A protein has these predicted regions:
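Alpha-helical repeat scaffolds
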Residues: 56-58
Length: 58
């Protein structure tokens, strides 16, 4: 949860580039550790940051 919360905090502080780096690092760490739930949450947060969360368009 640390990478997720750090990324969200950076987003709230208006630092999306840094948030993206944190999410991507967290994704790598979570996948290597086999933490698929954490990786999924980080991927969703990254997609939202990048405007790739299509569910909101409906």
């Amino acid at each position: 949860g640390t990478y997720y919360h750090a990324g969200k905090m950076l987003q709230q502080l208006g630092k999306p580039e840094q948030a993206e780096k944190v999410y991507r690092t967290g994704l790598t760490v979570a996948r290597r550790a086999g933490q698929l739930h954490a990786a999924s949450e980080l991927q969703q947060a990254l997609n939202q940051l990048l405007g790739l969360d299509y569910e909101d368009d409906e």
